[in-house]
Curated annotation (Swiss-Prot):
Transit peptide per record: 1-67
InterPro entries listed in its UniProt record: Pentatricopeptide_rpt, TPR-like_helical_dom_sf
NCBIfam families named among the record's database cross-references: PPR (TIGR00756)
UniProt main location, coarse: mitochondrion
Subcellular location: Mitochondrion
Pfam families given in the database record: PPR, PPR_1, PPR_2, PPR_3
PANTHER family per the UniProt record, alphabetical: PENTATRICOPEPTIDE REPEAT-CONTAINING PROTEIN 3, MITOCHONDRIAL
GO cellular component: mitochondrion
UniProt KW keywords: Mitochondrion, Repeat, Transit peptide
Family, as annotated: Belongs to the PPR family. P subfamily.
Lineage of source species: Eukaryota, Viridiplantae, Streptophyta, Embryophyta, Tracheophyta
Start and stop residues of the PPR repeats: 206-236, 244-286, 287-322, 323-357, 358-392, 393-427
Protein name: Pentatricopeptide repeat-containing protein At2g27800, mitochondrial
Species for this entry: Arabidopsis thaliana
């Protein structure tokens, strides 16, 4: 009976001693050591006791972190054996993990600290900039002062100071240069404050100003905010604020730059298609960049037939001739689906117009020809790619060597590796990897 009582009192003593080391904020959030919240499990023999909110003595010197609320994510547990042989289990939620954080986690923490760190205003430089302005300065003179200033945070305070001056009103030039300064410095919260001021004034705004706002919102990843600015332009009664072809270019580029996931591109492609239809219905003639955005979007979302339809309509319907980017997008999409016949036809048409495929198109052709068993065409395309100064990636070399061995052309694969080594087209590490591929297939 005395041993049981001493074990129970020792557990409570350890709990009280551990709570001394916990901050008052965390102490209020932790459960109190009673029978309901701390969940003491007492059996007839009291062989095991589980205490929430306590720390074993062996861990007390090594833990120097501040404990926070129960919303902390890591479960810290430890077991220790008492001198009498009894087992005590101790567990607690803490905010930090004992494992080393990954590189991506460290990068996110660093970026979060940089974004949350508030810049400090240089007061002397601020007063010096104000002193250079004339007594009755105009918005153009303020815009020139903001342009010459390198500190974007000082520009933001200078803009706000000018807003408080009597008989001064901002115009498009001062709004525009301030937004460009803050957007280029990635001070999006301060930029958003100025954008709200622009939207609150009806007679302020033009196409260049709103295009810059949309551009920097897309750079910040705020697509919804950018689309709302676009809708404001469409419904604006000021004709100078209506969207132009450049506005649609910014939105197309932002929507199609969301990654290489075909499902994500399929979702965003619906928005691109509706924007393109709205652009045509509003009387804006699409140019080759807008049409290439459609072709690229269809290729990224694996709708190559729709991309070919736009390609055939470019000169007939929209009076735009396809350029090298159009052919590069289509060749890559056709090769990704293994349609080497159509890709070869487009390649011949592209060369007939004097265009040279880029490295991505050549690599796609080499891989597609090799995977379809056309080894000779793949090797020919490879040497043509090297002659045109395009960079061959390691995947193309490996695919060509691997598929040559599958077809039983070991001599051709060996000869290709020797030529690559003699012309120093691959480094030593890549050459050894290709030799291992050849020996593995042998």
């Amino acid at each position: 009976m005395s041993a049981t009582r001493s074990t129970f009192l020792g557990s409570i003593f350890r709990t009280a001693k551990a709570r001394i080391l916990i901050s008052p904020i965390a102490r209020r959030s932790l459960p109190s050591p009673n029978f309901t919240s701390s969940r003491f499990h007492t059996s007839s023999s009291l062989r095991q006791s589980r205490i929430e909110g306590s720390i074993p003595r062996s861990f007390l010197p090594s833990i120097h972190v501040r404990f926070h609320s129960v919303s902390a994510s890591t479960w810290f547990s430890s077991r220790r054996t008492s001198s009498q042989g009894r087992l005590a289990s101790v567990s607690m939620y803490i905010q930090y993990s004992t494992s080393v954080p990954t590189r991506s986690l460290r990068r996110r923490i660093s970026n979060r600290k940089k974004s949350s760190a508030k810049p400090i205003l240089n007061v002397s430089k601020f007063h010096e900039t104000i002193s250079k302005l004339p007594p009755r300065f105009t918005p153009e003179e303020l815009a020139d002062a903001i342009t010459l200033e390198e500190d974007p945070f000082l520009c933001f305070h200078l803009f706000n100071w000018a807003s408080q001056q009597p008989r001064f009103t901002h115009e498009n030039c001062s709004y525009h240069i301030a937004i460009r300064k803050l957007g280029a410095a990635k001070m999006y919260q301060e930029m958003d404050d100025i954008v709200n001021q622009v939207l609150s004034v009806r007679h302020i705004g033009n196409e260049n100003l709103y295009n810059s706002i949309i551009f920097y919102f897309t750079k910040a990843g705020k697509l919804i905010r950018a689309v709302n600015i676009f809708r404001h332009m469409v419904t604006s009664k000021n004709l100078e604020c209506r969207p132009t072809i450049r506005t649609y270019h910014i939105l197309f580029k932002a929507l199609l730059g969301r990654g290489n996931n075909s499902y994500i591109n399929h979702v965003y492609m619906e928005t691109v298609r509706s924007l393109f239809r709205q652009m045509v219905d509003s009387g804006i003639e699409p140019d080759v960049f807008a049409l290439n955005c459609l072709v690229k979007g269809y290729v990224l979302s694996l709708h190559v037939n729709d991309a070919l339809r736009i390609f055939h309509q470019m000169s007939v319907v929209y009076d735009c001739e396809p350029n090298s980017f159009t052919y590069d997008y289509l060749i890559h999409g056709l090769c990704a689906q293994g349609r080497t016949i159509n890709a070869r036809e487009l390649l011949s048409e592209m060369k007939g117009k004097g265009f040279v495929p880029n490295g991505k198109s050549y690599n796609s052709l080499v891989n597609a020809f090799a995977l379809s068993g056309e080894i000779d065409d793949a090797v020919k395309c490879l040497w043509e790619m090297i002659e045109n100064g395009r960079v061959v990636d390691f995947i193309s070399y490996r695919t060509l060597v691997d598929e040559s061995c599958r077809k039983g052309k070991y001599d051709e694969a060996t000869r290709l590796l020797e030529m690559l080594r003699e012309k120093q087209l691959v480094d030593r590490d890549s050459y050894d990897k290709l030799v291992n591929v050849l020996h593995k297939d042998l």
